[in-house]
C-alpha cells in the first residue's frame, strides 16, 4: 500500500492536464524551473557570504588555521591559550552526624 505505481503517475498527469490545460502546462513547468534556479543561486550566494564573513572575522581576530598533523618523532606545538586552572574539591568543614 503506499507504493507509487505507473498508473498513479498516469492519473496524476491526466489531472494536471485537466486542471491547467495543455497550453499552460509547459509555461508553468518553465516558470517553476526558473524559480528553482533563482532559489538555488540565492542560497549559494548566502552560503558564500557566510563563509566570507567567517573568514574575515577570523582574520580580524588573529586566528590562524590549524597546523598540519604532527609527524611521528616531532613534538606538538603548545597551545597559545593557557590551560585552565585545576580546581580543588570543596570540603565542608562542618560534618553532620545522624545523632544530632
UniProtKB/Swiss-Prot annotation:
Domain of life per record: Bacteria
InterPro entries reported in the protein's UniProt record: TatA/B/E, TatA/E
Region Disordered, residue ranges: 46-100
Single GO biological process annotation from the record: protein transport by the Tat complex
Protein localization: Cell membrane
Residue stretches of biased makeup (Basic and acidic residues): 46-58
Compositional bias of kind Low complexity: 69-78
Keywords: Cell membrane, Membrane, Protein transport, Translocation, Transmembrane, Transmembrane helix, Transport
Family recorded in the similarity comment: Belongs to the TatA/E family.
Role noted for this protein: Part of the twin-arginine translocation (Tat) system that transports large folded proteins containing a characteristic twin-arginine motif in their signal peptide across membranes. TatA could form the protein-conducting channel of the Tat system.
Cross-referenced PANTHER family: SEC-INDEPENDENT PROTEIN TRANSLOCASE PROTEIN TATA
Cited NCBIfam families: PRK00575.1
Entry protein name: Sec-independent protein translocase protein TatA
Species name: Salinispora tropica (strain ATCC BAA-916 / DSM 44818 / JCM 13857 / NBRC 105044 / CNB-440)
